[in-house]
């Protein structure tokens, strides 16, 4: 059995088991698949499990190897609470599990994006919406609703629109409910999307060159990389038998070191031959390590199974990726544990929103919030239970109505806690434990930072 087929079989078996468990047990935030004394296979430590309904802290320390070895990551997190919020996704998700612990048995389990925030909204020449499905899984719908709500509050705060935040959340939840009630709902792209697309290049050489600049040295001979990549090319021969045999031949490969929440994950960019031997029709692929999610206790699919993000993106995306596949690298290749990766095409034009520069007016943010609400409202129940899809959507609508006050309170509380945790993180970093003298000067003077807050260009807080 090939690694790809084995992954499909494992995902099917886990999905069936998860369904049976939901019938037999009410999941609680206190449960975990990790036994006492064991650690999850993750580059970051798992958050403490909540006890007696106590929410885990959102505070992390800047005095760690994660930041000393990644000074650029530290700088991005210090820029404002939203960057910090992006980095602590596992801690944040577990905090939401804890807050809704007593209600989890009655909250539908859905296709969960599991890292919903505004800077994961991207525009391409083919589509728009939340992308980057590394954390996607099956779990309670409130995780996406609360996380995106906090992202909107932090974005309003950064732009000086705090008085608009609650209205943004209302728009998001209203659009979410509308999509649940009407699974055929479509809305036009927000005006921001059209403005960004107007700046896209149609010159392939320029687009390919820009992607190639992101490739950093592999650190190993390309031949070693190609040996593992063959797993993926074998899958593509089955999925796309009409493509020429050389379509996925590697022309250039490199490490990819961008992002905040995924900054510590292993990622690669590849330039492959494409449909002809002409450079202009080359294709860019991204290879990303599949995240281990065992630090989040109330979701159902926690292990790093490569088919998890592949299936979830097909259900959640407005426009699913092309050329999706997987690679499994065994311990014998020098890793401490088996590593799994998923692969997909990168578009020529790919623009992620920025909370500081993408929204010129509150209406811009309002429109994106509504668009994400529709995307999640359509994607959350998709293919979960086709024979009972109408009943599932109705249950989801009633759940949001029943828990709306609790959801809004969780958004408000976790926004405050995230900001407070970021201030503590920043104070500790500036005290000298994580920053050298030059970096301290940069954050205190060059950016105009004035503890405890960073003023934004629009007069709001960071």
PLM regions and their residue ranges:
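Short N-terminal edge-element motif at the start of the domain
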Residues: 232-247
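N-terminal secretory signal peptides that target proteins for export/translocation
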Residues: 1-10
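Signal peptide processing junction and immediate N-terminal pro/mature segment
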Residues: 24-40
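Long, low-complexity, intrinsically disordered segments
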Residues: 457-462
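Bacterial N-terminal signal peptides
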Residues: 13-27
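Sequence-structural signature of the catalytic-core scaffold of metal-dependent phosphohydrolases
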Residues: 182-235
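Conserved ATP-binding subdomain of kinase catalytic cores across diverse folds
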Residues: 37-66, 79, 83-113, 118-195, ...
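Acidic, carboxylate-rich catalytic segments that either coordinate divalent cations
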Residues: 407-456
């Amino acid at each position: 059995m090939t690694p790809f087929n084995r992954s499909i079989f494992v995902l099917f078996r886990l999905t069936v088991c998860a369904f049976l468990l939901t019938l037999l047990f009410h999941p609680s935030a206190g449960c975990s698949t990790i036994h006492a004394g064991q650690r999850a296979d993750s580059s970051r430590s798992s958050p403490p499990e909540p006890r007696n309904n106590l929410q885990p802290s959102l505070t992390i320390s800047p005095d760690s190897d994660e930041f000393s070895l990644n000074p650029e990551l530290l700088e991005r997190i210090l820029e404002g609470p939203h960057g910090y919020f992006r980095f602590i996704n596992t801690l944040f998700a577990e905090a939401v599990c804890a807050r809704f612990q007593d209600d989890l048995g009655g909250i539908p389990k859905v296709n969960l994006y599991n890292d919903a925030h505004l800077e994961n909204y991207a525009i391409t020449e083919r589509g728009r919406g939340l992308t980057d499905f590394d954390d996607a899984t099956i779990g309670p719908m409130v995780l996406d609703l609360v996380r995106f709500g906090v992202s909107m509050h932090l974005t309003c705060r950064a732009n000086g629109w705090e008085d608009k935040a609650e209205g943004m959340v209302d728009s998001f939840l209203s659009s979410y409910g509308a999509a649940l009630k009407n699974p055929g709902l479509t809305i036009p792209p927000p005006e921001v999307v059209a403005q960004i697309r107007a700046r896209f290049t149609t010159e392939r050489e320029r687009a390919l060159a820009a992607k190639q600049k992101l490739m950093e040295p592999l650190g190993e001979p390309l031949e070693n990389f190609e040996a593992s990549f063959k797993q993926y090319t074998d899958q593509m021969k089955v999925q796309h038998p009409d493509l020429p045999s050389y379509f996925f031949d590697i022309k250039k490969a490199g490490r990819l070191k961008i992002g905040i929440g995924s900054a510590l994950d292993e990622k690669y960019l590849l330039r492959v031959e494409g449909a002809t031997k002409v450079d202009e029709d080359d294709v860019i692929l991204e290879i990303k390590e599949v995240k281990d999610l065992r630090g989040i206790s109330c979701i159902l699919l926690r292990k790093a199974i490569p088919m998890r993000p592949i299936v979830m993106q097909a259900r959640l995306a407005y426009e699913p990726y092309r050329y999706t596949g997987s690679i499994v690298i065994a311990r014998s290749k020098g890793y401490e544990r088996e590593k799994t990766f998923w692969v997909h095409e990168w578009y020529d034009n790919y623009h992620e929103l920025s909370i500081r520069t993408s929204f010129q007016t509150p209406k811009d943010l309002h429109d994106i919030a509504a668009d994400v609400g529709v995307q999640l409202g359509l994607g959350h129940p998709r293919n979960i239970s086709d024979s009972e899809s109408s009943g599932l959507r109705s249950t989801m609508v009633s759940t949001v109505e029943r828990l709306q006050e609790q959801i809004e309170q969780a958004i408000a509380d976790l926004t405050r806690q995230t900001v407070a945790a970021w201030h503590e993180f920043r104070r500790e970093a500036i005290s000298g434990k994580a920053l050298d003298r030059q970096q301290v000067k940069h954050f205190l003077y060059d950016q105009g930072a004035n503890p405890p807050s960073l003023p934004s260009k629009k007069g709001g807080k960071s």
